[in-house]
Amino acid sequence: MKSNRIFISWLRWPLFIRIGVIILCLILLFGQIIYILEPKQFTSVFEGIWWAVVTVSTVGYGDYVPHTPLGQAAGILLILSGASFVTAYFATLSAAAFSRQHRYIEGKVAYKGRDHIILIGWNEKTNRLLKDLQLAAPSKTVVLIDESLTEGPLIENVHFIRGHAADDGTLKRANITEAESVMITADQYKSETDADMLSVLTLLSVKGLNPLAYCIVEILTDRFVTNAERAGANQIIGTSEFISRAMLQHYQVKLRPSKQQNGIKLTLDQHVELLAVPDELKGAAYKTCVLYFLDHNTTIIGIQKKEGPMLSPPLTYKVLETDQFLAI
């Protein structure tokens, strides 16, 4: 029974370690044997071990050569037995390296770093965001979580994890407990309602594992904004509201053409500007401020407070004198 347990324990070792142990035993054994068979040619056990290493690796320097039939027979036996194990050893290492690389591309390798950004969902917005993050923080590692991709994008400083973002196992493989920030994008393959439900569920899973993570979540419908706030979102991006304002701005530009506007192409890439609160808007509701600036061909996307930016605040929010408008 004891020998059986030892054999089972031996089989549990990784294959390349077992082969390496066998090769080491062969080298030590034949180094001792050749020293005993030809003491004149091999004056020490170390010289025998050196000869065994050179022989088993099929290098064959020729500095030590057995002269007796017994020594030559030992050399033949070592080549036949040892060379096969050495070949199997390096083949196993190569296969293990290839397998790990393949598992890395498929998103099956866990991330071990810390202070990273977790980006959930793969779409054109995410692709653009990754490029912008590389420009803004080139040394920051981004862990991409997505279930639809079979292979991760080969982008520098991007570690791909394949799996459902709301699953604890997937988040743990992304090392969520050590993450600095989490960005959750809406699932493009679901309806708006289902996508928002999944985003809130993912947010709950993230906050449950790392309450200190700074979470930015994309919400498509207004009715899920409150749920996202309750789930602990630090910032909520209302895509529908942002797009509607931008389209309205484009429409107003069309209605009010001017010589300076001819030939100008407006995009969503405009730089965000900070605007002071006009005297007539101090204490006014955020909705009133939005309409005021729309009349002046300016789109407001949020409020810059002393504590930090607040994107898409409630329409009933009262603007303070110390606030600033985030405008594009």
UniProtKB/Swiss-Prot annotation:
Annotated Gene3D superfamilies: 1.10.287.70, NAD(P)-binding Rossmann-like Domain (3.40.50.720)
Give the residue range of the signal peptide.
Answer: none
Q: Does the keyword Flavoprotein apply?
A: no
Tell me which InterPro entries the record gives.
K_chnl_dom, NAD(P)-bd_dom_sf, RCK_N, Trk_Ktr_HKT_K-transport
- GO cellular component terms attached to this protein's record: plasma membrane
Question: Does the record carry Signal as a key word?
Answer: no
Q: Where, per UniProt, does this protein localize?
A: Cell membrane
Q: Which Pfam families match?
A: Ion_trans_2, TrkA_N
| Record field: transmembrane | 19-39, 42-62, 73-93
RCK N-terminal domain span: 114-238
The membrane topology of this protein is:
Multi-pass membrane protein
Q: Which GO terms describe its molecular function?
A: potassium channel activity
Superkingdom, natural source:
Bacteria
Instruction: Name the UniProt key words of this record, in alphabetical order.
Output: Cell membrane, Ion channel, Ion transport, Membrane, Potassium, Potassium channel, Potassium transport, Transmembrane, Transmembrane helix, Transport
**The protein's name in its UniProt record:** Putative potassium channel protein YugO
Organism encoding this protein: Bacillus subtilis (strain 168)
